Amino acid sequence: MRTHYCGDLRSEHIDQTVTLYGWVDRRRDHGGVIFIDLRDRTGIVQIVSDPQRTPDSYNDADASRSEYVVKIVGKVSARQEGAKNPKLPTGEVEIYADTIEILNGVHKQLPILVSSSADGDQVKEDLRLKYRYLDLRRETMAKNLQLRHTVVKSMRRFLEDDENFMEVETPILTRSTPEGARDYLVPSRVNPGDWYALPQSPQLFKQLLMVAGCDRYYQIARCFRDEDLRADRQPEFTQLDMEMSFMSFDEIIDLNERLICRIFQDAQGIELERPFPRITYAESMEKYGCDRPDTRFGLELVNVSDIVADMGFKVFSGAVKSGGQVKVLPIPNGNDAISNVRIKPGGDLFNAAVEMGAKGLAFIRVREDGAIDTIGAIKDNLSDAQKQELLSRTGAEAGTLLLFGAGATDIVNKSLDRVRQLVGAEMGLINENQLNFVWVTDFPMFEYNSDEKRLEALHHPFTAPNPEDLEDLATARALAYDIVLNGIEIGGGSLRIYQREVQEKVFQTIGLSETEAQEKFGFLLEAFEYGTPPHGGIAYGLDRLVMLMAQEDSIRDVIAFPKTQQASCLLTDAPAGVDQKQLKELFVASTAPEKD
């Protein structure tokens, strides 16, 4: 029976006899003495097989190779002074093997090098995903899975032991509802022609749990969305889902800050300062051009629409007159850091802005003598008074580069936000070890969907409006809050609607007829007739949170068996075709074109 894990052995275990199981990470033969680095999910420890000292272990030690599965029984010994390895937590000890038993070997050439000395990160991701069971043996991936486990354990302990939450499972097979991304649909065999949907979130069920009196609910919930994938998206993902009755806006935020602080303390020994800063949606869009600001660095946007509104340069004045904006991204020392080539057509910053919908980037460079360099059309139409006001408002000093966005407000914001991120990273303004949390509040209830020519809920249609704005729901602020870490949203929630008449008004505002609302959400509306308590909640993207904590670039590196950006599993070759008999039982016929 195993007595210890490899990575747990320390000086206090010296002279103890231990039984270990694991994989051979490396094997080295030094003049007849064989050294094996034995690896399990906790780390590596050095095994010594000396034919003079422990002859019974030598033959199997000699026969072992990388990734062989072995059992080791031996005595923990102190390494000699010159042989200690400060890079390993177990580096002060080694195990002299009394017996080594090979439990299984490797019968094919390894498609991925697993050893801690190999640079596994350089292996193509497709190969890593195809042989994920080997990829997960690597030290980095094993640590990521352990971190994820520790985070979830911390969440559970805080919510259950400290805050009296109940963990309740909600259905995976439910009904399709409007709003949000496309659903994954499941045909019903026993109800031909009817379909289930896999849940995009447990939203409605957790609100019904509040009606039921389960006043503090949480769940580590699996969720599904059939949408185009990015680096931080998966078709199936995991949330920490929470809902609470009888708590105010500020009380919910306070509880969640304490939760986040506990997670970072338990998982990484990091003490966070609270309360976290708060910023309104309007302020975030104005200063950062987005609703998920990265506050680790400055470079805040400055609105100069009023200064250039009457300017002869039509790109600026025309944008303002058509209802748009002109904003500036001031970059101190930008003259030296950023050449004209990069902000003119074909340059990387120019292209980044264009990808976000902008037509280009106008610029002004402030010289050492206070004069400006820019294109003639700006210089010829900028009065001295406008120039001075522009430099004063942006705080521009000698050496500052001013980059302008002009046009529709959303395009100006998106393009300058993108350029700001690129410049901040390139100029070394971002401390990768810094953790900047910020709450974004006072979101609009609705945004306009130009394709469908209607309002739609910015978050979801169950978010409570600010009581001060009930007279005009179309322009109301929501009692919503997003928590952002280093420019990435890790969670979001709101106080909920709990009165039928308010919920019906919201449905009307987003264009749902009374019949449609009753058909799709009648069960919720009826529940609101039976004494529904005030409530609110939040959901965290567990994958994104762990990705940030592990300082990985993709959530695929913190998920055991992720899908590719084409929503496929290279390990199991899913999705795949099914037998026609199965389709017939489900009364489903495929209209997809035949594969080549």
UniProtKB/Swiss-Prot annotation:
Listed PROSITE patterns: AA_TRNA_LIGASE_II
CDD domains in UniProt: AspRS_core (cd00777), EcAspRS_like_N (cd04317)
GO cellular component annotations of the record: cytoplasm
GO BP, sorted A to Z: aspartyl-tRNA aminoacylation
Presence of the UniProt keyword Nucleotide-binding in the record: yes
Region Aspartate: start-end pairs: 203-206
Subcellular location: Cytoplasm
Keywords (A to Z) from UniProt: Aminoacyl-tRNA synthetase, ATP-binding, Cytoplasm, Ligase, Nucleotide-binding, Protein biosynthesis
Coiled coil stretches, renumbered: none
Major location (coarse): cytoplasm
Subunit structure comment from the entry: Homodimer.
Name of the protein in its database record: Aspartate--tRNA(Asp/Asn) ligase
Species in which this protein is naturally found: Picosynechococcus sp. (strain ATCC 27264 / PCC 7002 / PR-6)
